[in-house]
Amino acid sequence: MADSAVIFFGPRKAFDEMVERETAEDERSVTYLESIHVARIKSSDLITRDLVLKAPERVDSCVVHADDFGSVLSHVLPSFATILEQTFDVGKLYVQNPPKRVFGSLKASQPQGTLDVVHYEYPLIEKKRLNDIYDKLQSDVLGQDEGKESLIASLYRLAAMNEERPSVIMFYGPSGVGKTETARCLSEAVGGELTRVQFSMMQTQEAYEYLFGAEHSKASFARDLLARESNVVLIDEFDKVDPRLYNMFYQLFDEGRYVDTNYDVDMRNALFLLTSNFNSEASARRAMGPAMFSRIGASVHFCDLGVDEKVTIINEHIEFVLSKLDEEDRATIEQSDVQAWFIEHAAKYDNMRTMKNKIEMAIFKKLSAPIILSGRKSV
């Protein structure tokens, strides 16, 4: 097998940075997919026997990304080490987020003392960072003062208690008032892009396969967790999750461990943010049941925004759209009544996402009106 091997669990960016630090530009490096090509494993082939007749080519390193495993058939996974050994004589092997069968193959094939397992260290939420987090929430998220205070209190508890188990916080309230934006803002403040899961976009069978792990080549919750860039995970519209799937979250929220068919994920010290449209904690408890609700460490209420806050959003979003337009179109909108109309009717909008869409449609209807008028005249 390889002279030495590193198994890395964590995001691709950090994995690539590690490989770049440890390899030289003039090294002969290959990917695992090149190994598959050399081994002539096609859509329905097994490992060819004549490979042993030719000595494997010596290479300095072999780099295997998590996505590579989705490009091969399932019979390749337990034969991972065998295929590589028969095609290349590898100096150092780097593998990101291998499925359990590949991990087992590597542990069995690598000589003792030549296999290192590296877990990416995600930034923790520390007390000294709470001021910066609160300042970012204040600047990026309008209103929701009580919700922000409850969130900071929950984060303080997470930092002070220093428990390895994950922290689970539920945001509840009407749609389009800043729940998802708050989660995104928090992830940026902690460091890294937010990992967002939307179960409302999945049918029951699709959600089942996503959670339990079906084919290794398909998207899965475990694979997305392994690839996360920050330790903040947003499960959007958790109230839309089929209650029959709740048991998949019990061990995750209790112990910080998630196991499916293909992966075993360490999620200790993670922060899970669950958004929902429940109008109260009582309604959430009734809908979710005591077993699921008791695993939520804190519930943060998001209320409807005030008129002044809605006007601020209107002005900011119109300015954002105008920044994308050329000078002529910008002048047309500035001279129109679009902005004044939305400010006058701000109170009627409860969902800010819907309001922004309406603003954009009003702007582009105004700009496209001459095209429609010209077309009608030519008929």
Predicted regions and their residues:
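A short helix-turn-beta junction within AAA+ P-loop NTPase domains corresponding to the substrate/partner-engaging
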Residues: 105-125, 192-194, 286-304
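Walker A/P-loop
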Residues: 4-30, 165-197
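Conserved AAA+ ATPase "sensor/coupling" helix adjacent to the nucleotide-binding pocket
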Residues: 110-114, 312-328
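Pre-Walker A (pre-P-loop) alpha-helix and adjacent loop at the N terminus of AAA/AAA+ ATPase modules
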Residues: 127-168, 361-367
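Conserved alpha-helical scaffold flanking the Walker A/P-loop in AAA+ ATPase domains
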Residues: 44-58, 212-237, 262-263
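AAA+/P-loop NTPase substrate/partner-engagement loops
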Residues: 189-217
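Canonical AAA+ ATPase core
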Residues: 90, 97-103, 217-221, 237-245, ...
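N-terminal accessory segments that target, anchor, or regulate ATP-driven/P-loop NTPase machines
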Residues: 1-120
